[in-house]
């Protein structure tokens, strides 16, 4: 769905705070939940609340939230990260519904794997790994097109979206097979 395009003189706020710990379910802790949700969700929502009065008073501008394809569906090692990004995706959709009629653009950036210090923690294959430069180019292109959701690389992100249409048992089987991660602790 197309939204507001970003042009040179637009006011754009990008919320890109995030933290990630690769955790399996048996490694879950209340501390990991608090820290991840505080950064990935509460921090972003609070910062959005702080900037919204200015944008609404201006009647223009845009907000971009950085989610993740990990928010599309349950994935091994994304025990807290995935749900935090799923909530952020939902938040961006709500913002778009409420703010776009008032002249405020809302963008959701859902990258696949991008080579960063956070993804360097992963001990598994990361399909379609992007450089930060490739990610930046995809984001700028998405802003220019006025895409609500800017997701990349397309082949990878579209495959993950299609998996969500499958019955859950088939989804689980395919994810386990693709990742090689099964529910047995080491």
Positions of the model-derived regions?
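C-terminal helical subdomain
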Residues: 108, 124-159
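Active-site helix of classical SDR
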Residues: 48, 84
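Substrate-binding pocket helix/loop in short-chain dehydrogenase/reductase
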Residues: 24-25, 32-37
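Conserved NAD(P)H cofactor-binding loop of Rossmann-fold oxidoreductase domains
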Residues: 16-21
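Active-site loop immediately N-terminal to the catalytic Tyr-X3-Lys motif
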Residues: 26, 75-79
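Alpha-helical segment proximal to the catalytic Tyr-Lys
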Residues: 53, 97-101
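Residue(s) in the substrate-gating loop at a strand-loop-helix junction
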Residues: 68
């Amino acid at each position: 769905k197309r939204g507001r395009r970003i042009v040179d003189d637009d006011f754009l706020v990008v919320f890109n705070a995030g933290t990630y710990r690769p955790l399996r379910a048996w490694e879950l802790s209340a501390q990991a939940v608090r820290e991840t949700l505080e950064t990935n969700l509460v921090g972003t929502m609070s910062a959005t609340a702080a900037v919204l009065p200015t944008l609404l008073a201006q009647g223009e501008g845009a907000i971009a939230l950085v989610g993740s394809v990990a928010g599309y569906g349950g994935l091994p090692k994304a025990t807290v990260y995935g749900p935090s990004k799923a909530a952020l995706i939902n938040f961006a959709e709500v913002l778009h519904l409420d703010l776009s009629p008032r002249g405020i653009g809302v963008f959701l950036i859902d990258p696949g794997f991008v080579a960063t210090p956070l993804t360097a923690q992963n001990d598994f294959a990361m399909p379609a790994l992007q450089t930060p430069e490739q990610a930046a180019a995809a984001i700028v292109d998405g802003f220019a097109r006025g895409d609500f959701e800017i997701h990349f690389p397309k082949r990878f992100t579209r495959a993950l979206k299609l998996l969500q249409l499958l019955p859950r048992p088939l989804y689980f089987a395919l994810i386990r097979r693709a990742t090689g991660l099964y529910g047995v602790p080491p």
